[in-house]
Amino acid sequence: MSNQVFQFPPYYHKEPFFTIQPILNTRKKQFQMWQDLILQYCRYYKIYELDINESIKSNSVLFNNEKINRKLSREALKSIIDDIIENGFAEWVDKEKEKEKEKDKDNNNNNRVLIMWRKPDEWASLIYKWVADCGLLNTVLTVWEIQNGDDSKKQEFHQLNTTILMKSLKVLEKQSKCQTFSQDENVGVKFFSI
């Protein structure tokens, strides 16, 4: 984590930003701005999961601007998160809760969301390039080595969320660039040159 504080964009300091806009085109632009802000903030602090209830309850600075006395409501935040999910940059952590939500649109059980400020295919490209650049093709690495190893310390995917890493490795498997295998709790990955 950086010692510096995240710099919020100017629009974060405008009161209308915290109120869902009634005009569709304006709301689309507003949701895009919220998506950009949430992804940038999460990337800056390497946040991979957000708990909506906790963010609202704790008055998270991301959703609560005390200087202008404005904060997002839980309903507004859920609408924004739903839009981010629709755009492929997030998903509910508990898939069963997502299914429940489809049955009952007013369901408030969805709380934890996986934030993907890079999509799995982007992470897959970065990981594969790193493996190739380090001369690790046709060798076996553990998921732990990719996430936490000394060789990956300077890589953006160092300490990457396990769920996102596994999704990224699935992308590489579909491209025939790697194969994952597990023994007990350890997951290994063999990367192939193609």
From Swiss-Prot:
This is Vacuolar protein-sorting-associated protein 25. GO terms for molecular function: protein homodimerization activity; structural molecule activity. It is found in: Cytoplasm. InterPro entries: ESCRT-II_cplx_Vps25-sub (IPR008570), ESCRT-II_cplx_Vps25-sub_N (IPR014041), WH-like_DNA-bd_sf (IPR036388), WH_DNA-bd_sf (IPR036390). Component of the endosomal sorting complex required for transport II (ESCRT-II). It comes from Dictyostelium discoideum (Social amoeba). One of its GO terms (cellular component) is ESCRT II complex. Component of the ESCRT-II complex (endosomal sorting complex required for transport II), which is required for multivesicular body (MVB) formation and sorting of endosomal cargo proteins into MVBs. The MVB pathway mediates delivery of transmembrane proteins into the lumen of the lysosome for degradation. Keywords: Cytoplasm, Protein transport, Transport. The gene is vps25. Belongs to the VPS25 family. The keyword Protein transport applies. One of its GO terms (biological process) is protein targeting. The keyword Protein transport applies.
